[in-house]
A protein has these predicted regions:
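Alpha-helical hairpin
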Residues: 2-3, 38, 67, 85
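Short alpha-helical segments that sit at the start of domains
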Residues: 1-12
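Intrinsically disordered, acidic Ser/Thr/Pro-rich low-complexity regulatory segments
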Residues: 83, 87-328
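Short, flexible active-site-proximal loops enriched in glycine and acidic residues
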Residues: 21, 58-62, 81-88
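Contiguous, well-ordered alpha-helical segments that form the cores/surfaces of helical PPI scaffolds
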Residues: 11-16, 285-287
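Short helix-capping/hinge SLiMs at alpha-helix to coil transitions
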Residues: 16-23
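N-terminal helix-turn-helix
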Residues: 27-79
């Protein structure tokens, strides 16, 4: 639906003022907050038109209007066309991304924690694309009770996993050297797809430690199919103080519903986007974490319909920009 430039300005004011202080918009408040050189009567007509088009609704308790779900969606779609990375509270993101000594799960957790603190809303990260990680090193360490620790270096930190199989130190070392030699610089997905061909051509060389490699590939294949969620609620205290109890209960319910979180984050686009709820629902601003153009994870900031979309989108843009720099 096409809106005139003036209607867009008025709608933006209505949304931003309601987000800021829950104040319904009137023709008088629009005139006070814009440089539009038109009469109050003209502004009243514009508000009437926006209401008739479904972007605003009138409250019974006052003469003012507030945004509808349709109004929020129009505002957010236009906002996300030109997101600026301006959040100074996210300066530490660069250091976190560049730290290769941490695990992938640590990096994801730290990023989610920083975003939650910066936006004052709970943040969820879902990792569902480890096949896109670039491999740098393998270290396999035998443990007690027929277990082995597998450490895999990647371009986004290391992955660690304890697997249920027994092996000698020598076979673990040989398997580590073999996997590093042939798959360093390749993606996890490439290794999982092609490992059988490599092993067929080298059956004599790898016979002693083939069982170790088989167990690792089996474990990584299983891990690759999993969707790992990391929920950070550092920013929730301020949100709880600001929002009414009904909104907070809905958000907490969603945070405790793993299936719903996975369903929402599975639908993340390859750019910053938002799922704006119907009236009185939960909204999610989402962004992908990409590796070589392929999705490694999805970040979702969860809040009420009346949330700070601009600030959240800016925070996510900082993270996306830093990850893109790291990827080059």
């Amino acid at each position: 639906m096409e809106l005139s430039e003036r209607k867009i300005k008025i709608l933006n004011i209505a949304v931003e003022e309601f987000i800021k202080d829950s104040a319904p918009i009137t023709s008088g408040s629009v005139k006070d907050k814009t440089a539009l050189n038109v009469s109050t009567a003209t502004l009243r007509n514009e508000l009437n038109a926006l209401e008739a088009m479904g972007f605003l609704k009138q409250l019974h308790t006052s003469g003012g209007r507030v945004p509808t779900a349709q109004g929020y969606r129009f505002y957010v779609e236009n906002l996300l066309k030109d997101v600026k990375a301006t959040n100074k509270e996210l300066d530490d993101v660069r250091k976190i991304i560049e730290n290769r000594t941490q695990s992938l799960s640590e990096m994801i957790s730290k990023i989610a924690k920083i975003i939650s603190k910066a936006t004052n809303y709970p943040t969820v990260v879902m990792v569902n694309g480890i096949e896109n990680l670039v491999l740098t090193e393998f270290k396999i360490i035998p443990l007690l009770e027929e277990k082995c620790m597998v450490l895999i270096g990647t371009n986004y930190g290391y992955i660690s996993n304890t697997m249920d199989f027994a092996a000698s130190m020598e076979n673990c070392q040989d398997a580590s050297n073999y996997l590093t030699k042939y798959f360093k610089g390749e993606t996890m997905g490439y290794m999982l797809e092609n490992i059988d061909e490599y092993m067929k051509g080298m059956s004599g060389e790898i016979k002693a430690f083939q069982g170790v490699v088989d167990n690792i590939i089996k474990g990584l294949s299983k891990m690759n199919k999993q969707k790992l969620l990391n929920v950070q609620t550092d920013g929730m205290a301020k949100m709880v103080d600001k929002e009414d109890g009904k909104d907070t209960k809905k958000i907490i319910k969603m945070l405790n519903d793993e299936e719903e979180l996975i369903e929402v984050l599975d639908k993340t686009d390859d750019h910053i986007s938002a799922d704006v709820s119907d009236d009185e629902g939960v909204s999610v601003v989402k962004a992908p974490i990409l590796v070589g153009g392929n999705k490694l994870a999805s970040i979702g900031v969860i809040g009420p319909q009346k949330m700070d979309y601009s600030g959240i989108a800016s925070a996510l843009k900082v993270v996306i920009d830093e990850l893109e720099k790291h990827n080059k």
